[in-house]
């Protein structure tokens, strides 16, 4: 694969507002940062620092990129926040003014056992145990658009760190000016009491899956209702997926008062009428006047964060860089993939012809083509200038 010797003007201008976060001018960390994002987008391989060398200029050595990632002179959280804010402002707003904040966690498997944030874990009781580190991701979504706005790594030595990080993300997030209503969507792992109080205090709506251990005000658990609910109480309702396809569920709707949560609308849903209690999903919301189909359609948007995680892992090599055993260094290396995603959305998010299907891989193809075209045009201008000099001398 051919290399590049110059950062395209469009990329440099898109990242220039972040230059103030890179304090070490002597080491030119901002330029190294720009090159690393471009290399992550262009690299189809494993995404390691040594694997990115063919996509970097010959003068940029391996140890220069390592020192930049290890350096503590740039705040990765502030860089992600500023680039996400600029990206949200550059995209066209929805007609209804509703912004959805979707949170989820994922596990990045690692083979080495000395990872500073690694631990043995599994996705569910039916999956095998794997060793890796966990990442919490928060995205902003509306219509067909998905924009990562915050990222953090879970420390296994801190109890309840996942919900602590999620609350910090919600606290730090500043909605764009066009957002008239914000709805938070997450699964049962994020439904902590402190998180629900924070969402209520910020006057956000929420659509959460609830664990069966949650209690009513009379002391009974949700699992008691799910276990003994007759099939005759469920009725069929249609919902829509984010891509517009229809999905029918058998639902039971009830207005209830939950312990430490207050008055909510509770939806018990299952895909088939004859499914048992274990296949029932409990969804709770504070949206007043929302029908069962609307609640299910909103919760279906949670699939957007799953797609974003898949794109980050397969397309932008999330967590594949081999760095030291420093936790902050690992966080910086993981955040580079999210920053590369934001760069692509920042450059092409407003172009409806490119963003019609909202596919990261199509954005990568478009970016690689533009970088190649820019390199060819720059080489052509250089040789035309030299030819003109030869003619003037002759």
Model-derived regions, located:
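Active-site-proximal, Lys/Arg-enriched surface segment
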Residues: 39, 67-144
